[in-house]
């Protein structure tokens, strides 16, 4: 195994910063390994990871079953287009659909969340023959041109106008606005069961149930974006289970591959059949390597029932955060281990202090919200340390 000196690591950090496109604001540290809910930088500092790869690491960093599955598959076959069937693709389809409602029985595999949403939008237009989409204010579906079109945040959208049209944005959790927006021209309504980038805002049961009823009445499709909420994050396998509904298309990614890039649009058979042959495609989507990772990730999730851990630890964690006696806190909200701490001021300085002073990694969800997306394998003692770190920086 190659051994690197600290000088080597620093040179690589400098290379990333200087040769990168510059789109991202880089932290001043180099993460070199991870295990479970911990990561380590090049200088040996240990961090509690509540970023979790933006929700990728539900099963923990370096999950041994995913690692072993990837090793085995890499030795056998890594790439093969979807026109040529492979055993692992069939295994993934069978494994994924087995944990979903029977209505969701057709899979279009991709590499990422934004690709899953792009596919969903195209399938919706193909199925309905309509053009219009309805999305929510503060909603986030991705940054490629189609998914960006149903992402609300103006700073993401405005530099790239014109986008896919027409799209109508409504206030999240506003049933009356939803009724007014969905009409006979609407192809689909696309919603997150919990808005992530928009501030960790859960949907009300009334809103999502109304979305299901209204789309059915108007002949439109309901797309649920569970890129971040899927794979146990909210205390159920999938967040839609909290609401007693089934969408027409479910989009998944992030934790689906256990750390390997993998996404999917899962849909009803009649929706899948509406897309003409060759109407959509992907070179790497459904590759055997990602399929093997996905199978291992789902099987690990099912055996360990990690969603039950999220259902137990999430409310406890939120109550501990609510008990912090700080006038800077406006609200604590979330679902399972998808938690947002909203402040009355900018969140960025406090996130930086959590990292530098307490070795806790967290992320923003809008200007004033600290978002926590720890691996679902995190120990309660680590969450207690996170609470104490938050208490210290907000003192």
From Swiss-Prot:
Compartmental location: Cytoplasm
Record-linked PANTHER family: ACETYLORNITHINE AMINOTRANSFERASE, MITOCHONDRIAL, AMINOTRANSFERASE CLASS III
InterPro entries the UniProt entry points to: AcOrn/SuccOrn_fam (IPR004636), Aminotrans_3 (IPR005814), Aminotrans_3_PPA_site (IPR049704), Class-III_PLP-dep_AT (IPR050103), Class-III_PLP_Aminotransferase (IPR053513), LysJ (IPR037537), PyrdxlP-dep_Trfase (IPR015424), PyrdxlP-dep_Trfase_major (IPR015421)
N6-(pyridoxal phosphate)lysine PTM sites in chain numbering: 254
Chain sites annotated for binding substrate: 143, 282
EC number assigned by the record: 2.6.1.118
Pathway per the UniProt entry: Amino-acid biosynthesis; L-lysine biosynthesis via AAA pathway; L-lysine from L-alpha-aminoadipate (Thermus route): step 4/5
Cytoplasm keyword on record: yes
UniProt cofactor note: Binds 1 pyridoxal phosphate per subunit.
Protein name: [LysW]-aminoadipate semialdehyde transaminase
Primary enzyme class: transferase
Record-linked NCBIfam families: argD (TIGR00707), LysJ_Th_th (NF042418)
Subunit structure: Homodimer.
A GO molecular-function descriptor: pyridoxal phosphate binding
Chain's gene name: lysJ
């Amino acid at each position: 195994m190659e051994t690197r000196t600290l000088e080597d690591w620093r040179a690589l950090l400098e290379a990333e910063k200087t040769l990168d496109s510059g789109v991202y604001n880089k932290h001043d540290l180099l993460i070199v390994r991870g295990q479970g809910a911990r990561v380590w930088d090049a200088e040996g500092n240990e961090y509690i990871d509540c970023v979790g790869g933006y929700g990728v690491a539900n099963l923990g960093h370096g999950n041994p079953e995913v690692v072993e599955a990837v090793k085995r598959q890499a030795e056998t076959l890594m790439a093969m287009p979807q026109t040529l069937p492979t055993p692992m693709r069939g295994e993934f389809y069978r494994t994924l659909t087995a944990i979903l409602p029977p209505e969701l029985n057709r899979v279009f595999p991709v590499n990422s969340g934004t690709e899953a949403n792009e596919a969903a939008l195209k399938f919706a237009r193909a199925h309905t023959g309509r053009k219009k989409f309805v999305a929510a204010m503060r909603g986030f579906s991705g940054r490629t041109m189609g998914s960006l079109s149903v992402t609300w945040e103006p700073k993401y959208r405005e530099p790239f106008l014109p986008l896919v049209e027409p799209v109508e944005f409504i206030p999240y959790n506003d049933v009356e606005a939803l009724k007014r927006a969905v009409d006979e021209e609407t192809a689909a309504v696309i919603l997150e069961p919990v808005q992530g980038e928009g501030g960790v805002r859960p949907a009300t049961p009334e809103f999502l149930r109304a979305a299901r009823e209204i789309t059915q009445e108007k002949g439109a499709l309901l797309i649920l974006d569970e890129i971040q909420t899927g794979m146990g994050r909210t205390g159920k396998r999938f967040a839609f289970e909290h609401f007693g509904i089934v969408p027409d298309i479910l989009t998944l990614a992030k934790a689906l591959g256990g750390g390997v890039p993998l996404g999917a649009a899962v849909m009803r058979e009649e929706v899948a059949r509406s897309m003409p042959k060759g109407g959509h495609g992907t070179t790497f989507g459904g590759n055997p390597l990602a399929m093997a990772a996905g199978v291992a990730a789902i099987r690990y999730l099912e055996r360990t029932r990690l969603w039950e851990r999220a259902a137990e630890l999430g409310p406890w964690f939120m109550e501990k955060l609510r008990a912090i006696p700080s006038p800077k806190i406006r609200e604590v909200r979330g679902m399972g281990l998808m938690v947002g701490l909203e402040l009355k001021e900018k969140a960025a300085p406090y996130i930086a202090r959590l990292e530098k002073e307490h070795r806790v990694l967290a992320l923003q969800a809008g200007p004033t919200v600290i978002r926590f997306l720890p691996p679902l394998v995190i120990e309660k003692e680590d969450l207690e340390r996170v609470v104490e770190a938050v208490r210290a920086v907000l003192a």
